Structure formats: structure tokens, C-alpha cells
């Protein structure tokens, strides 16, 4: 009589069930690049904010720190746009690539102060030579990039809040499994219209974050409009 041998299939452990050491070894190079860019952006923000020199006095130092900030800001935005596209195409690991809560908060705070600093530099720089024109141009670019970073960082905060809460903090119509695109959509909607549009906010904590986001976006947009009017009128 022939005995039937049943093969034993050993299931591979899920990433969430692996020990911390194993999970740390699974951190992709792309995630490390993201962390490095986030840290460099924070350092560049500190360099821009804490620069004691007047841009009209120390043109070289201001231009260098501003150029570094713009470079890292473009990298930050490019990484986030790439994440949104990959999540939209079905990448199931996009939650693992989100910035931590502390990092996201620090980037939001540093970006807000950087915007105010760049706006003041634009308003206080006098003269019409080439260096002053470069300073003004850098200031405008920094303000626009800071505006985009603000809403992208809030999108990640909303995603973290949704994923870590016991009950969903947001409800997207006909979207039972939202991706990063939905949170970016919601964040930019709040930032441009100061409204939640068709998204339902379902927790008190989420409403508090949305309120702070809306107020900060109002200040941002007001500063940008004032800056544009000042540049157009020459004041």
C-alpha cells in the first residue's frame, strides 16, 4: 500500500510579524534616501532661518543657503510625487514610506518659518542690480516650493492618522481603500479652498489638524498674494 506524502509548505512570515531586527533589514535604499533628503531639508531650513546676515550685506551666503534649500525642496517634492504615482499604480507598500510624525511636524514648522523668512527678504531687499534680482527670484521660488511642501507634508500626516487610528478618521466617497493620492487631494483641497470638499472628517483629532492646516494655509496664501502684488506694483 502506497502512502501519500503530503508536502509541508512553510508560509513566509509577514513583514508585520517579523522581529524588529528583520524589519530594519528590509528598509529599502529608497526609504533611506528619503530620510536623508528630509534631514538635509531641515538643516537647509535652519541655515536659511538662522542666517544672521542681511541678504543685502552678505549676498554670497544668502544665495548659497537659498540654493541648497531649493535643491533639497525639489528633491522632497519629487520623491512625494513619485510615491503618489506608485501608490496610484497599485504599490501596496506606500504606507511604509511615509515620513514619521515628528519628521512631518518638523518639516511643516521649518517650512512655515522659511516662507516667512523668504517673504521678509523679498520685502526688505532694495536695489535693482543683478544680485538683488537673484535674491528676489530665489525668494519667490522658495515661497512657492514651501507652499507645495506644506500641503504634501500635511497629506502624509493625514495618511498616518488614517492608518494608525482604530476607526477611520476620514471617509472618501466610493473609495474603501484610499491611497496616498486621496490624502494629497484632500490636503491641497484644504490648502486652496479652506474646505473639505467631498471628504468626511470623522474624528475630533482629525478636525483639529484640519483646522490648523486651514489657518496656516490662509496665512500662506495671504502672504503669497501680498508678495505678488508687491512685485507687480514695485513696492
Segments from the language model and where they lie:
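Pore domain of cation channels
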Residues: 182-189, 201-235
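The first (N-terminal) embedded transmembrane alpha-helix
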Residues: 28-55
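Membrane-water interface of transmembrane alpha-helices
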Residues: 74-88, 152-164
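Membrane-helix interface/capping segments
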Residues: 79-97, 120-128
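Alpha-helical transmembrane segments
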Residues: 52-75, 134-150
Amino acid at each position: 500500500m502506497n502512502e501519500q506524502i503530503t508536502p509541508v509548505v512553510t508560509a513566509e512570515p509577514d513583514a508585520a510579524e517579523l522581529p524588529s531586527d528583520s524589519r530594519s533589514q528590509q528598509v529599502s535604499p529608497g526609504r533611506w534616501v528619503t530620510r536623508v533628503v528630509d534631514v538635509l531639508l531641515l538643516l537647509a531650513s535652519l541655515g536659511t532661518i538662522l542666517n544672521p546676515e542681511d541678504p543685502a550685506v552678505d549676498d554670497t551666503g544668502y544665495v548659497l543657503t537659498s540654493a541648497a534649500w531649493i535643491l533639497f525642496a525639489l528633491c522632497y517634492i519629487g520623491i512625494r510625487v513619485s510615491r503618489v504615482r506608485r501608490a496610484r499604480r497599485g504599490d501596496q507598500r506606500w504606507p511604509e514610506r511615509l515620513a514619521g510624525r515628528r519628521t512631518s511636524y518638523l518639516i511643516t514648522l521649518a517650512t512655515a518659518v522659511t516662507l516667512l523668512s523668504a517673504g521678509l527678504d523679498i520685502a526688505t531687499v532694495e536695489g535693482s542690480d543683478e544680485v538683488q534680482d537673484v535674491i528676489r527670484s530665489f525668494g519667490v521660488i522658495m515661497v512657492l516650493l514651501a507652499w507645495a511642501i506644506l500641503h504634501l507634508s500635511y497629506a502624509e500626516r493625514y495618511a498616518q492618522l488614517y492608518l494608525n487610528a482604530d476607526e477611520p478618521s476620514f471617509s472618501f466617497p466610493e473609495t474603501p481603500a484610499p491611497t496616498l493620492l486621496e490624502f494629497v487631494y484632500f490636503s491641497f483641497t484644504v490648502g486652496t479652498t479652506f474646505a473639505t470638499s467631498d471628504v468626511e472628517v470623522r474624528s475630533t483629532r482629525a478636525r483639529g489638524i484640519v483646522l490648523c492646516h486651514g489657518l496656516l494655509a490662509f496665512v500662506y496664501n495671504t502672504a503669497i498674494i501680498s508678495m505678488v502684488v508687491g512685485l507687480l506694483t514695485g513696492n
